[in-house]
């Protein structure tokens, strides 16, 4: 503000004194307490009455912590890229991707997202149940889908209205001026659930794309592999419908090794069958030779 006033005065533009602001009469937003946030029970109830699209958004928001703006900016291409470490190089069509991952239950997708608020990219992840829900929703889409198509086909206004409808149907009421069940509350759920599951606040901030100060941003860089490993350790905290206490989330490399091992086992089995056939033919041939020798 001082810079603006200095600019005007420098060019001899008269600036009237502004009235002083009385902090006592400013309407401040009501504080949000932990007990007022939706817990897993509430989120499960919301999930049960939601449309397939909103089911996908709810699970994605809870497990990724993405803000509404970033959620709506994601494309099909972004989603395929987030799944790429689990896919062969030639899988680029979204329906091929969904078919390929149909029987894989431990996919933790990695999103590189540009946060509009800070204009910086950050990494976050979403849970296997969110991936399943997104895939189920995409299979119901009736419009042609390209890499540039939005991942969630919904406008900002309709998304807000959908959250409001769920909130009012469940009778969840309001927290201050806002309804209790809304997208920003799911972002708060994500942060609080991870923090209360003993994830460090720095890691939580990294997953939510919150800005570091310039010095920290320049000198302290998060290792993506370590961040994903840390996220997987706390995955049960942000998983809503699935019991993941005993879920073994395997690395893509290990999954690939398992698949290659299955192929090798199949090939070895085929080779053994061929050897058995050759042994049988050899015995038959020796029998014929012996009979011919005895006859002569």
How should these model regions be labeled?
Residues 142-149, 161-206, 210-213:
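Short, basic (Lys/Arg/His-rich) helix/loop patches that form interaction surfaces
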Residues 208-259:
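Catalytic-site neighborhood detector that most strongly recognizes the C-terminal catalytic loop/helix
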Residues 253, 260, 267, 274-277, ...:
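Heptad-repeat coiled-coil/leucine-zipper oligomerization helices
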Residues 40-72, 187:
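Basic, Lys/Arg- and aromatic-enriched nucleic-acid-binding interface segment
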Residues 74-133:
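Conserved tyrosine-mediated DNA breakage-rejoining catalytic core shared by Y-recombinases
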Residues 116-136, 146-167:
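C-terminal catalytic core of Y-nucleophile DNA break-rejoin enzymes
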Residues 13-45, 117:
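Flexible interdomain linker/hinge and immediately adjacent N-terminus
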Residues 1-13, 126:
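Non-catalytic DNA-binding core/recognition domains of DNA-processing enzymes
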């Amino acid at each position: 503000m001082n810079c603006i006033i200095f600019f005007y005065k420098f060019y001899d533009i008269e600036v009237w004194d502004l009235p002083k602001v009385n902090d006592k009469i400013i309407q401040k937003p009501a504080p949000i307490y932990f007990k007022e946030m939706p817990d897993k029970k509430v989120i499960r109830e919301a999930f049960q009455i939601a449309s397939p699209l909103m089911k996908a958004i709810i699970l994605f928001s809870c497990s990724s912590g993405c803000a509404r703006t970033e959620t709506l900016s994601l494309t099909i291409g972004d989603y395929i890229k987030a799944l790429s470490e689990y896919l062969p190089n030639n899988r680029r069509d979204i329906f091929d991707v969904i078919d390929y991952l149909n029987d894989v239950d431990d996919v933790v997708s990695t999103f590189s997202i540009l946060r509009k608020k800070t204009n910086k990219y950050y990494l976050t992840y979403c849970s296997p149940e969110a991936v399943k829900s997104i895939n189920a929703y995409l299979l119901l889409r009736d419009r042609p889908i390209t890499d540039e198509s939005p991942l969630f086909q919904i406008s900002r206004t309709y998304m807000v209205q959908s959250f409001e409808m769920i909130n009012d149907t469940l009778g969840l009421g309001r927290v201050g001026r806002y309804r209790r069940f809304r997208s920003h509350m799911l972002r708060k759920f994500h942060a609080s659930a991870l923090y209360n599951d003993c994830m460090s606040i720095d890691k939580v901030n990294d997953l939510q794309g919150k800005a570091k100060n310039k010095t920290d941003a320049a000198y302290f860089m998060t290792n993506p592999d370590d961040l994903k490993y840390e996220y997987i350790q706390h995955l049960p905290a942000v998983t809503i419908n699935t019991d993941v206490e005993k879920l073994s989330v395997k690395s893509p490399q290990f999954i690939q090794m398992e698949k290659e091992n299955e192929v090798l086992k199949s090939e070895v089995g085929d080779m053994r069958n061929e050897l058995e056939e050759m042994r049988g033919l050899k015995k038959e041939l020796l029998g014929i030779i012996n009979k011919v020798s005895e006859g002569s």
